[in-house]
Design a protein with these regions (language model features):
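Subset of outer-membrane beta-barrel
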Residues: 1-296
Length: 296
């Protein structure tokens, strides 16, 4: 289920209700269509710390008038070291290093003035390495692949509303040792909308407010989970965000309230977020997210 770990401080702070959001390499992990109208090159690092582990996603985005928007990304998740000990004495003689890696290549393009489309191909790898005296410790390296696809559409009404649909983690079962031990990928279907509250701009100059609402579930969409988020910005410089994930999907994802802040300084965008899910917060260690983007 490491493919479901949320990536990106902005996305987390908005309650992960981001399927209709545009701009920023976080869209690689949510809806690749959100990259379609990017106008500047971007290098970004998205860092996370949670009870699951510590992870970093690095992305490079390149917009081309002729080809569309191309993005390459790597996500690395370290779920913690485990000691190898001598039976009976407990003396540590080695260290087990379990890790997850995802390599992603994304293509996105606008279609006319109202439609965005995007596709991501991902190669996921689970590795268990060992250092030191590792006799009897299994060394594992398993690789699988998946596809994410999404579209966004600007509704032709006076209000600025975008809707989005994305399917993530489509692909064959992830095989660890043999076919009997393979697991199906956590495929998700997410639909939602974002609305820019333009009437507030006339009341508070320089203030922009955007609200998002999404639903997400497995492909059967029998019991979708709702997600909401709001983004308040002042002169495109300072941002306050909040969101809520109402329930988990099949016990696989974190849920609860989230908050975040963002600052823009020239070409640099800094975003921070915290997710107050019941389990991690109960242990006094809510997941923390930090994103740094450089646009040029």
């Amino acid at each position: 289920m490491f493919l479901l770990i949320p990536i990106g401080a902005k996305s987390v702070s908005l309650g992960q209700a981001v399927v209709a959001e545009q701009g920023g390499t976080e869209a690689v992990w949510w809806n690749p269509a959100g990259l379609a109208r990017a106008e500047k090159k971007e290098i970004a690092v998205h860092h996370l710390e949670s009870i699951v582990g510590t992870g970093d996603a690095v992305s490079f985005l390149y917009p081309s008038d002729a080809l569309g928007v191309l993005t390459g990304s790597i996500f690395y998740l370290d779920i913690g070291e485990q000691p190898v000990t001598v039976p009976g004495t407990g003396t540590q003689v080695g260290t087990i290093l379990p890790r997850f890696l995802v390599f992603a290549a994304t293509y996105a393009t606008p279609i006319g003035s109202r439609v965005n489309a995007g596709l991501t191909y991902k190669v996921a790898q689970f590795r268990v390495d060992c250092t030191g005296f590792c006799t009897g410790v299994p060394i594992i390296s398993s690789t699988g692949s998946a596809i994410d696809a999404g579209v966004q559409y600007s509704i032709p009404i006076p209000a600025p509303v975008w809707v989005g649909v994305a399917v993530r983690n489509l692909g064959p079962k992830f095989q660890v040792k043999d076919s009997e031990q393979s697991d199906p990928l956590p495929t998700r279907l997410q639909v939602g909308a974002t609305y820019e509250v333009t009437p507030l701009q006339r009341l508070a100059r320089g203030v922009d407010v955007r609200v998002n609402a999404d639903f997400i579930d497995e492909l059967n969409f029998e019991s979708p989970s709702a997600r909401i988020g709001a983004d308040i910005s002042y002169r495109k410089f300072a941002y306050f965000r909040a969101g809520y994930v109402f329930k988990e999907v099949e016990g696989s994802e974190q849920y609860g309230p989230s908050i975040g802040l963002g600052l823009t300084a020239g070409r640099v965008q800094l975003d921070m977020a915290r997710l107050f899910d019941e389990f991690s917060s109960g242990l006094g260690d809510p997941p923390t997210y930090l994103s740094v983007r450089y646009l040029f």
